[in-house]
């Protein structure tokens, strides 16, 4: 069977396996499909609805083609989300990642520049003078010195370039909007992933189980891809190979409830200025609580605290006692040669 026949067989199967999905996506990573075949693949999956097997197989194909990163697995947390919620808030998960790094937990964040919002994770980190675009050796030094590094996704996933012209032409969400946060070359044991579409929650949790994550939280917070302080958050938790679905509120985390409008952000430099204020202990209550909620979940995943509530309170303590501000002064513009 040639690769086009294999693709057609996959696309006409309403319930393919992860292995079949991987076999269909591997030619894409090698540049073997024409744009017409790529468009057929993406549009058909969009119409059928992506399953956990589709996403797992596609992820395996792109991880197989990815450039490796030396630090992997145990004790590594990634915090990427899907974006696309249209809320244009400050960079909550990125700011929370830095709080967690300052608190002694390792974060290897894989991401990109802004696509759908005014400020992506790379944009705000660049404005905070956190070194980006490091080669793997220097990125390892950065992790060892600071507990944090940022992996610029295009540098590790050159195969994604094969699909970009078609994605731009289609101008609609595709499986790649979901795949992006899953494709860290660090293959982290721990992950928190915010999703804009709550219908994906159980599916993504199943994908994390299949990809070997030890612990993961998939979160949707009242319309945004973060843990919310403006309403309840739905969580799908992977732990001990079991997926549990539940809801938490800001009050259950020991935090106050705030209007979403109080978390409005701007571009990279504007959001970086807001994060500096928060780290210096001068952020608004809404901004502090929003970062603490997400950081608390990250501390919980790392087993630094037994509950998310205690993690959120630890995050507030690290903001108040200057630990996070000191971390930023120490590590911005550092040379990791």
Region spans (language model):
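Glycine-rich anion-binding loops and their surrounding alpha/beta cores
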Residues: 2-9, 15-16, 61-67, 71, ...
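Short beta-strand segments at enzyme active-site cores
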Residues: 37-38, 107-110, 218
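N-terminal glycine-rich anion-binding loops that anchor highly charged ligand groups
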Residues: 1-2, 9-56, 64-71, 290
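Short amphipathic alpha-helical face segments that pack within enzyme cores
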Residues: 40, 95-99, 290, 294-297
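Active-site cofactor/substrate anionic-group-binding motifs, chiefly glycine-
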Residues: 49-115
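A glycine-rich phosphate/pyrophosphate-binding beta-strand-loop-alpha-helix module
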Residues: 42, 90-146
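Residues in well-ordered alpha-helical elements
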Residues: 19, 36, 53, 137, ...
